[in-house]
Design a protein with these regions (language model features):
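A nucleotide- and high-energy phosphate-metabolite-utilizing enzyme signature
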Residues: 1-316
Length: 316
């Protein structure tokens, strides 16, 4: 379910263009974040990424930083171009690097030492939560592994304080209130709605932040694998996990179907009969199942929301 070129396919030509006629000063790794990091991206998904570089031995650090920025910016430009040969109805690949330190105001690429300094001194709790999805996807493999070694103590901390738990809970409430489209029906919002993707993912990530240090199975960027590990460790009841995973999978499938059908609001369960029928068939329902899909989604997410509210606010 890919759109456009993968980072690994454009990194080398981007590097060649950016350093033409000059000595290579640094090595670079691309870190997948969000759904890309979790290997869960589908039709229409953004590609959330961060970039890390490491100057080569003897290279001037400032010159290496400047060169790394040129390579990264050229890579981003190439990734946004249509693939060749052209694909009918291709959607432009949206590459989002806003999860990097300091967001849009921060450097597009940082050295390993710069990341270390930031996470030690200035990072907020939600940034450690975002790192639960961080996974090297392209570039220098050894550097990618070094980045993982750097971030593991922050995303899988030995101690996750009650205050940090409260910070995550407050941030979740803020995201729900600020990012929900004005006037939207919360029961039909696939991503931010009640029992939707966000509820399941935030709950799983909170479990990881609190317990992954002691439970190796939770050290995964995959939502469903982490949920399975939580069940195995006795942190989440199997019946609750089944409800959560069922709602997450159905919301994911509907979202992909919306994109393929060209539904204008791809993060919303359609209300029109024709759209619902088409999405139902995409989800594997027999013909004439528009109402069944709607009822199933509303029921499953209603149950998932109950599980989320109980577990997200209790002392797991």
């Amino acid at each position: 379910e890919r759109e456009g070129a993968e980072p690994a396919e454009v990194a080398e030509p981007a590097e060649a263009e950016a350093v033409a006629g000059e000595k290579l000063l640094t090595r670079i790794a691309v870190i997948g974040m969000g759904r890309l990091g979790g290997a869960e991206n589908g039709f229409g998904s953004d590609a959330d990424v961060m970039f890390v570089h490491e100057p080569l031995d003897g290279a001037d650090e400032d010159a290496a930083q400047e060169q790394a920025a040129r390579i990264v910016n050229r890579t981003l430009a190439l990734l946004k171009q249509p693939v060749k040969p052209a694909i009918r109805a291709e959607r432009p690949l949206e590459v989002d690097a806003d999860l990097r330190p300091e967001g849009k105001q921060g450097a597009i690429v940082r050295s390993l030492d710069s990341y270390r300094s930031y996470y030690e001194r200035w990072a907020e709790t939600w940034e450690f939560q975002a790192l639960t999805r961080a996974r090297p996807i392209a570039g220098d493999e050894a550097l990618g592994e070094a980045f993982v070694e750097l971030i593991d103590p922050y995303r899988y901390p030995a101690t996750f304080t009650p205050e940090q738990v409260q910070q995550i809970r407050r941030m979740k409430a803020r995201v729900e209130n600020e990012r929900m489209p004005h006037g939207a029906d919360r029961t039909r919002q696939l991503k931010l709605g009640r029992g939707g993707l966000s509820d399941v993912e935030w709950l799983v990530q909170l479990v990881q932040l609190r317990h992954a240090h002691a439970v190796p199975g939770l050290r995964t960027t995959s939502t469903l694998k982490a949920l399975d590990a939580a069940v195995e460790a006795g942190l989440v009841d199997a019946a609750d996990a089944e409800i959560l995973s069922g709602a997450w999978l159905l919301a994911t499938k509907i979202r992909g179907g919306n994109v393929l059908r060209g539904v204008r609001q791809s993060d919303t369960l359609p209300s029109g009969r024709a759209d619902l029928e088409a999405i139902a068939r995409w989800c594997g329902y027999p013909a004439g199942s528009a109402r069944a899909l709607e009822e199933d989604y509303l029921r499953q997410t209603r149950n998932a929301r109950k599980v989320y509210e109980r577990l997200f606010f209790e002392e797991l």
